[in-house]
Design a protein with these regions (language model features):
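A structured beta-alpha segment of the ubiquitous adenosine-cofactor-binding alpha/beta core
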Residues: 18, 58-110, 288
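Flexible, small-/acidic-enriched active-site or ligand-binding loops
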Residues: 331-374
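Aromatic-enriched alpha-helical interface/lid elements that frame and gate functional surfaces
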Residues: 230-302, 306
Length: 374
């Protein structure tokens, strides 16, 4: 049954976003806003190329213009545009937009209701504010990498950008939408300062109290969630892996039954280090006795918080993600469609509209920059 108003209603249709950001954090933030119905205009540098091959996804449903911000006429175009926009998002180093005459104070004087979000590695203040960096650097400075991985192998190398996405993008969206609510109540906009390092530091949420209140030094393989317990990945006979998170007693009991060793449950409930090592070793040896797909079949019948480590291709075909519609077909503007990851936000009255894949840079120049009186 179709959700009431789903075809007609978009959550953010009243918001217009001027997006100067590059790479991943800003574009992913504005992708989320666009998926939720915001009118996003991407401002790109003339001649810009899609070096990562992901812009057709990141720029989905966005309009595109090209402006050379080193030219005075381009600056004037921005100042005219900003009169009509609710939100500006930028990702330059601190001070760059100010030097261009496009900082918050300058644009605020044109549009007092403007919400201006800056995403940087270290924020607009502090001794590192001008320092370059990437995701791997931000999570390192934030302490996340310090207790990841293994003692022998060193910090874990993540396959996705934690600081960029969980740090920068998601916190930027939270900040922007909070500012929108504040503006609706007060009539005033504001500047938002998103540091990917700050935001990554908050991701220490579950481990930080052990240090800040308990004085425990956070180290690899020392705590429950980072290899210091049986909560871990286990290799199967054919070289693949299973994830085991059977922390609660009922799940732990189901795990022991699934691996054919119900007698291990009593051992698993002991809190001393030696018992913990023995239990983890027993799990490791058990998983090595069967192939990956055998374990998949076995754990289908057990609620043990044990799941296979899937490839992305396998994940995209997983019945749970397919049922949730997490892969969608988006028009590419050439009469074809391309598969992309869907918007994960689902509500009772809203269905995302995927208008088109990312456009060619400057595709909307004639429509937007050459309108009379602009």
């Amino acid at each position: 049954m179709e959700r009431e108003g789903a075809r007609l209603m978009t959550l953010l249709t009243h918001l217009k976003v001027l997006d100067f950001s590059t790479l991943l954090p800003g574009p992913f933030a504005t992708l989320m806003l666009a998926d939720l119905g915001a009118d996003v205009l991407k401002v790109e540098r003339p001649g810009a190329k899609d070096s990562w091959g992901v812009n057709q996804y990141l720029n989905r449903s966005k309009k595109s213009i090209t402006l050379d911000l080193k030219q005075s006429d381009s600056i004037e175009s921005v100042k005219k545009l900003v009169k009509e926009y609710d939100i500006v998002i930028e990702q330059f180093r601190p001070g760059v937009m100010e030097r261009l005459g496009l900082g918050y104070e300058a644009l605020k004087s044109i549009n007092p209701k403007l919400i201006y979000c800056s995403i940087t590695g270290f924020g607009q203040t502090g001794p590192y504010k001008d320092r370059p960096g990437h995701d791997i650097n931000y999570i390192s400075i934030a302490g996340l990498s310090g207790y990841s991985g293994t003692k022998k192998g060193g910090p874990a190398k993540n396959g996705t950008q934690i600081a960029d996405l969980a740090g920068g993008s998601l916190h930027a969206v939270i900040g922007i939408l909070s500012a929108v609510i504040h503006r609706e109540r007060t009539g005033f906009g504001q500047a938002i300062d998103i540091s990917m390092t700050d935001c990554s530091f908050t991701l220490n949420a579950i481990s930080a109290p052990l240090n800040l209140q308990g004085g425990l030094e956070l180290e690899p393989e020392k705590m429950m969630l980072n290899g210091g317990s049986f909560y871990d990945f286990y290799e199967t006979k054919d070289g693949r892996h299973f994830s085991v998170g059977s922390l609660e007693p009922p799940f732990r009991k189901a795990l022991c039954e699934a691996i054919g060793a119900p007698e291990l449950y009593e051992l698993s409930m002991k809190s001393d280090e030696e018992s913990g090592i023995r239990f983890k070793t027993a799990i490791r040896l058990a998983f090595l006795e069967r192939d990956f797909h055998e374990w998949q079949e076995i754990f289908t019948d057990f609620e043990a918080c044990a799941e296979p480590v899937l490839t992305f291709t396998e994940a995209a075909e997983h019945p749970q993600l397919k049922e949730r519609g997490m892969i969608v077909e988006v028009p590419d503007g050439k009469g074809n469609v391309q598969k992309q990851i869907a918007c994960p936000i689902k509500t009772s009255v809203f269905t995302p509209e995927y208008k088109h894949a990312g456009l060619r840079p400057g595709q909307n120049n004639a429509e937007i920059l050459r309108t009379p009186n602009r």
